């Protein structure tokens, strides 16, 4: 498990970045380990609660996903951090920060990037 970053520090860095004058909104995502199994939450299946998870990721795929977000209209700042190892309830899984010109574009970009990270870049194994 890695030490979680400071979102306050991330925002300070983003607002000092050369892209800051183009950004009218910054949006963050903080994914955490929850008690309810993914199968129960997403598919309504009867599944036991989890005590944690084993989490890993492919850095090259993460870098590619982040690079793709910069191709989206109005997106000027992107940062992502992913944890790794054995995580317990409430531990941080990931942080994502998106900076862009207007709310709809920033919201869409966050949805896009978190989806790509979760579906293409990470491996999660729930622990009981």
What residue ranges belong to the model's regions?
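N-terminal, polar/charged subdomain of small-to-medium soluble alpha/beta proteins
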Residues: 1-93, 99-128
